[in-house]
C-alpha cells in the first residue's frame, strides 16, 4: 500500500527563506560567516532565537572586527563593541583580528580575559605603543601573529619571539622598505618553529633571507612579495625552493592580502528582515554608540 504521507511541497519560485525559523545549528553556521560588528549591530537584533545563538560563548571563540577605517563616520564605538565581544567568549577566545582602532587598553583587556588566545591580528593599529604591545603579548600563548602596517620596533618583535615559544605563523606586512635585515635577523634568532612567514614589503636582503632559512628549518610557506631588496635567483632561489614548499616571489601580485580594504557584500543579506522592535526579550539592548561609557558597559547584564 502506498504511504499516505505526502512529500513536502517544493519551495515555489520567488519564495524567500524564513531566516528566523532556521534550526539553531544552521543559524550558528550562518552567523559564523559574519564579522563581530555585523552580528552585534544587526544579526542579533533579528529575533529572539537569533539573539540566543548570538549570546552563546561558542560564537565568540573567533572575533573578526574588520572595518574600513572610517571610524569618525560610525555610529558606534568599536572599542566598546570589541570588549563586549570578548566578554561574550567567557574566556574561550582563541583568535581575534582588529583593524584600525586597537589601543593599549583594549589589547590589555583582551590579554587579561583571554588566556587561551592563540591567534592575534593587528592591522593598521597605529595607536598601540611598543611597550603596551609587549606588556599584553607576553601574557599570551600565541602561535599566530599578524602585524600589518603597524609601527612596532624590532625589539618588540624579538621579545615576542622570546616569549611565544610556539610561534608557527608570522605575518609582518609593510609598505616597501629600504634595505634592512633587523626584522629578518630577529625572526631567525627567536622563532625557529615558524611554518608560515609572510614578509610583504619587508626590507630584508639576501643576508636576512639566508639567516631565516638557516634557523627556521620547519618553514613551509614563505611570502616575499614586494621584498625588492631580495635577489631571488640562482643559488638562493634554488635553496628556497628546495627547503620551502611554497615561495611567493617579490613581484607576485598582492591582491589576496587583506589589509583593511573593502570586502564584497556579506554572504547573507538581512536587509529584508525586520529588526526586533517592542520585544520584551530585547529590552535593555546595549548601545555601542560613542556616548556609552565603560561603567555602563561593565554593569550591563547580558
From Swiss-Prot:
<dbReference type="InterPro" id="IPR032675">
    <property type="entry name" value="LRR_dom_sf"/>
</dbReference>
<keyword id="KW-0539">Nucleus</keyword>
<dbReference type="GO" id="GO:0005634">
    <property type="term" value="C:nucleus"/>
</dbReference>
<protein>
    <recommendedName>
        <fullName>F-box protein SKIP19</fullName>
    </recommendedName>
</protein>
<dbReference type="InterPro" id="IPR001810">
    <property type="entry name" value="F-box_dom"/>
</dbReference>
<comment type="subunit">
    <text>Part of a SCF (ASK-cullin-F-box) protein ligase complex. Interacts with CUL1 and SPK1B/ASK2.</text>
</comment>
<dbReference type="Pfam" id="PF12937">
    <property type="entry name" value="F-box-like"/>
</dbReference>
<keyword id="KW-0833">Ubl conjugation pathway</keyword>
<dbReference type="InterPro" id="IPR006553">
    <property type="entry name" value="Leu-rich_rpt_Cys-con_subtyp"/>
</dbReference>
<comment type="function">
    <text>Component of SCF(ASK-cullin-F-box) E3 ubiquitin ligase complexes, which may mediate the ubiquitination and subsequent proteasomal degradation of target proteins.</text>
</comment>
<comment type="pathway">
    <text>Protein modification; protein ubiquitination.</text>
</comment>
<feature type="domain" description="F-box">
    <location>
        <begin position="16"/>
        <end position="63"/>
    </location>
</feature>
<dbReference type="GO" id="GO:0016567">
    <property type="term" value="P:protein ubiquitination"/>
</dbReference>
<dbReference type="GO" id="GO:0005737">
    <property type="term" value="C:cytoplasm"/>
</dbReference>
Amino acid at each position: 500500500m502506498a504511504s499516505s504521507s505526502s512529500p513536502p511541497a517544493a519551495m515555489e519560485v520567488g519564495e524567500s527563506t524564513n531566516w528566523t525559523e532556521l534550526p539553531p545549528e544552521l543559524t550558528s553556521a550562518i552567523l559564523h560567516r559574519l564579522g563581530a560588528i555585523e552580528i552585534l549591530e544587526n544579526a542579533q537584533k533579528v529575533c529572539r532565537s537569533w539573539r540566543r545563538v548570538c549570546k552563546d560563548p561558542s560564537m565568540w571563540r573567533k572575533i573578526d572586527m574588520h572595518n574600513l577605517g572610517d571610524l569618525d563616520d560610525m555610529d558606534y564605538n568599536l572599542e566598546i563593541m570589541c570588549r563586549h565581544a570578548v566578554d561574550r567568549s567567557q574566556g574561550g577566545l582563541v583568535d581575534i583580528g582588529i583593524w584600525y582602532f586597537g589601543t593599549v587598553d583594549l589589547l590589555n583587556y583582551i590579554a587579561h580575559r583571554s588566556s587561551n588566545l592563540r591567534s592575534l591580528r593587528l592591522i593598521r593599529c597605529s595607536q598601540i605603543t611598543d611597550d603596551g604591545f609587549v606588556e599584553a603579548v607576553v601574557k599570551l600563548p600565541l602561535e599566530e601573529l599578524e602585524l600589518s602596517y603597524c609601527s612596532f620596533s624590532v625589539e618588540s618583535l624579538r621579545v615576542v619571539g622570546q616569549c611565544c615559544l610556539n610561534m608557527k605563523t608570522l605575518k609582518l606586512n609593510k609598505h616597501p622598505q629600504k634595505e634592512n635585515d633587523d626584522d629578518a635577523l630577529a625572526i631567525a634568532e627567536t622563532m625557529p618553529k615558524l611554518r608560515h612567514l609572510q614578509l610583504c614589503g619587508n626590507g630584508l636582503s639576501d643576508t636576512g633571507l639566508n639567516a631565516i632559512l638557516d634557523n627556521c628549518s620547519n618553514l613551509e610557506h614563505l611570502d616575499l612579495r614586494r621584498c625588492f631588496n631580495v635577489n631571488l635567483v640562482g643559488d638562493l632561489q634554488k635553496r628556497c625552493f628546495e627547503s620551502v614548499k611554497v615561495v611567493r616571489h617579490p613581484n607576485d601580485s598582492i591582491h589576496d592580502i587583506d589589509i583593511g580594504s573593502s570586502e564584497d557584500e556579506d554572504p547573507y543579506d538581512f536587509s529584508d528582515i525586520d529588526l526586533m522592535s517592542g520585544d520584551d526579550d530585547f529590552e535593555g539592548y546595549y548601545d555601542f554608540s560613542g556616548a556609552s561609557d565603560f561603567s555602563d558597559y561593565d554593569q550591563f547584564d547580558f
